[in-house]
């Protein structure tokens, strides 16, 4: 049996007024927030999809369908904790995470340390096991036009 598994995740949400911006479980000061059924934390969603994908367990929509009112406004860190428990129950643990958040604004670098700490606490990791990079889309496409924010994540799982 393979002792390592790798998963890839992606998420994108539209930026709108009257919502808070949450990335990696941290509220980021900005005049716009992400629209979604839950808190629309694209970074945490991409990480969850990568974790699930590594074990061929589908995606977060399967476990937390947007059609189910019980997930309305859900804190993505609560969902991440459930996905983490799902992989732990199958005998796997997270080895490391590498991720990229793509946004024209706001500048995310000042918040990356807090995001890493918040995610590490949920996943029982050291902060240095979580890489978070921030970049822009060079004003190209919907993210470049500041219509949304997206995130990519790669997760390495290790058999316990």
UniProtKB/Swiss-Prot annotation:
EC number: 4.6.1.12
Database matches in HAMAP family: IspF (MF_00107)
Co-factor binding details: Binds 1 divalent metal cation per subunit.
Protein family per UniProt: Belongs to the IspF family.
Superkingdom in the source lineage: Bacteria
Enzyme class: lyase
Binding site for 4-CDP-2-C-methyl-D-erythritol 2-phosphate: 11-13, 37-38, 59-61, 135-138, 145
Biological source species: Nostoc punctiforme (strain ATCC 29133 / PCC 73102)
Cofactors, names only: a divalent metal cation
InterPro entries, per database record: MECDP_synthase, MECDP_synthase_CS, MECDP_synthase_sf
Listed PANTHER family: 2-C-METHYL-D-ERYTHRITOL 2,4-CYCLODIPHOSPHATE SYNTHASE, CHLOROPLASTIC
Gene Ontology molecular function, alphabetical: 2-C-methyl-D-erythritol 2,4-cyclodiphosphate synthase activity; metal ion binding
Phylogenetic lineage: Bacteria, Bacillati, Cyanobacteriota, Cyanophyceae, Nostocales
Catalysed reactions, semicolon-separated: 4-CDP-2-C-methyl-D-erythritol 2-phosphate = 2-C-methyl-D-erythritol 2,4-cyclic diphosphate + CMP
GO BP term, example: terpenoid biosynthetic process
Gene3D superfamilies: 2-C-methyl-D-erythritol 2,4-cyclodiphosphate synthase (3.30.1330.50)
Job description of the protein: Involved in the biosynthesis of isopentenyl diphosphate (IPP) and dimethylallyl diphosphate (DMAPP), two major building blocks of isoprenoid compounds. Catalyzes the conversion of 4-diphosphocytidyl-2-C-methyl-D-erythritol 2-phosphate (CDP-ME2P) to 2-C-methyl-D-erythritol 2,4-cyclodiphosphate (ME-CPP) with a corresponding release of cytidine 5-monophosphate (CMP).
Subunit structure: Homotrimer.
Binding-site residues for a divalent metal cation, renumbered to this chain: 11, 13, 45
Site (Transition state stabilizer): 37, 136
Keywords for the protein's UniProt record, in alphabetical order: Isoprene biosynthesis, Lyase, Metal-binding
Protein name per its UniProtKB record: 2-C-methyl-D-erythritol 2,4-cyclodiphosphate synthase
Pathway(s) annotated for this protein in UniProt: Isoprenoid biosynthesis; isopentenyl diphosphate biosynthesis via DXP pathway; isopentenyl diphosphate from 1-deoxy-D-xylulose 5-phosphate: step 4/6
């Amino acid at each position: 049996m393979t002792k390592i598994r790798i998963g890839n995740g992606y998420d994108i949400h539209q930026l709108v007024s009257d919502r808070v911006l949450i990335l990696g479980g941290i509220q980021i000061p900005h005049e716009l927030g992400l629209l979604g059924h839950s808190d629309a934390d694209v970074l945490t969603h991409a990480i969850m999809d990568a974790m699930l994908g590594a074990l061929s367990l589908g995606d977060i929509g399967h476990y937390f369908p947007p059609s189910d009112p019980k997930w309305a406004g859900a804190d993505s860190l609560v969902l991440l904790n459930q996905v983490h428990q799902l992989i732990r129950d199958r005998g796997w643990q997270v080895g490391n995470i590498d991720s990229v958040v793509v946004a024209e604004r706001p500048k995310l670098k000042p918040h990356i340390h807090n995001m890493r700490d918040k995610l590490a606490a949920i996943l029982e990791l050291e902060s240095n096991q979580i890489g978070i990079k921030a970049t822009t889309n060079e004003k190209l496409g919907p993210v470049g036009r500041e219509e949304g924010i997206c995130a990519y994540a790669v997760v390495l799982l290790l058999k316990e």
